[in-house]
Amino acid sequence: MGREFIPLFENWANSYDDTVVGRDLQYKEVFRDYDGILDDVVSRSGHKVLEFGVGTGNLTAKLLAAGKAVTGVEPSKAMREIAEAKLPENAVIVDGDFIDFPDPPFSPDTIVSSYAFHHLTNEEKREAVKRYGKMLGKHGKIVFADTVFKNREAFSAAVKKAKENGFLQLAEDLETEHYPTISEMETIFTSEHFSIAFQKHNDFVWVMEAAKL
């Protein structure tokens, strides 16, 4: 369920916010236009939002500032502690992951995530989307920002470029986690009765908006 990556995020928690502002050259392109990406997710969201992979709370903060009701789900204790320290007292962050999580205190009209869905295998992604489809009403939305590739050739080219640039940590990340292609994401969502559209933000990250049919 992506929880195998918790040790990575326990170690990354204290430096994550430095990474997203571009201080780690290996991930500078991954996080280019980070604020704009999060703002795009917020602008596509409804009023009652369930967020997965809260991390240090950057997207959560923007959702709350926009007046949304938000329940956040985050499996890493270290990340939750940082998020809770920076967010308003009324912020609700619970332990859980994309598939195993407590019911939120409201019926969400939007489910969001940023930089996290790739922790799930494609089979787990479909399992998660199936569950979300049961939670959302007609026209309910899933809005995810994450690294996605046009095709497997584009993925291979990204790994090759990372290695040529000496970005070995980035290359290992790409080869270890479960980064999908656009067609794979289309299949996952349409098979669970969602329409889906993609907006590219940088060489890695796209914002995906799926609506329940």
Swiss-Prot record:
Top-level taxon in the UniProt lineage: Bacteria
Positions contributing to S-adenosyl-L-methionine binding: 53, 74, 97
Pfam families documented for this protein: Methyltransf_25
Matches recorded under InterPro entries: Methyltransf_25 (IPR041698), rRNA_Ade_methylase_Trfase_N (IPR020598), SAM-dependent_MTases_sf (IPR029063), Uncharacterised_MeTfrase_YrrT (IPR023553)
EC number(s) recorded for this UniProt protein: 2.1.1.-
MF terms in GO: rRNA (adenine-N6,N6-)-dimethyltransferase activity
Keywords noted in UniProt: Methyltransferase, S-adenosyl-L-methionine, Transferase
SUPFAM superfamilies to which the protein is assigned, alphabetical: S-adenosyl-L-methionine-dependent methyltransferases
Keyword S-adenosyl-L-methionine in annotation: yes
UniProt signal peptide: none
Entry keyword Transferase: yes
HAMAP family, alphabetized: Methyltr_YrrT
Functional note: Could be a S-adenosyl-L-methionine-dependent methyltransferase.
Family: Belongs to the methyltransferase superfamily. YrrT family.
Protein name: Uncharacterized methyltransferase BLi02856/BL02021
